[in-house]
Amino acid sequence: HNILASGYAGAIGGTNLQGETVLGIETVTSASDIPEGSYDMVLVCTPASSNIELLRQCAAKGIRAAFVTSAGYGEAGDAGVIAERELVATARELGILLAGPNGQGVVSTPSQMCAQIVAPYPPAGRIGVASQSGNFVSSFLNWSRATGIGISRAVSAGNAAAVGVADYLEFFATDPLTDVGLAYVEGIVDGRRLMNRLSKVSQDKPLVLVKGG
């Protein structure tokens, strides 16, 4: 619904166990039935146990980016940690850029795309948002709607298993449609390395960093 409501003009497809028409979109029962070369990215909302095979099916159809919203990974104990490592290894093997898992989605106003499972579509602007907390992204997008202060991109990094907040901020630093980066971080594994990377980012664009508990 959010993708359609934002006015995204690219090809949109979906899977559904019954193969029904959903919101006017024809669906297929399996990713293996997706027409080859039709899509660039898959938004994964299926159980963690099915996602390895799903990535393989998508890769076979030419999809090279995946945003995994599914929970049940590194935040879910030892078994989840193992599942997350397998997910990352599979994505790398297949040449798929992996965002998430356990994130809420991604927004790009220049592309009129709101692939976000919770938040509203914000007005266009020049702020790039990257957050470890999906709720922070949702709150900021609601604030953006309320104030009219627009954004360029927003991404909920989730567990950041393969791509983290610093990676998104480095992209914002080179993005001609973003003037300032806003980041929210909770857990930091290697603080010195993170600060070194953010220091380089701040040489190109202003950066606001919020550290949560």
Task: List each language-model region with its residue ranges.
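Catalytic-core regions of core metabolic enzymes
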Residues: 1-213
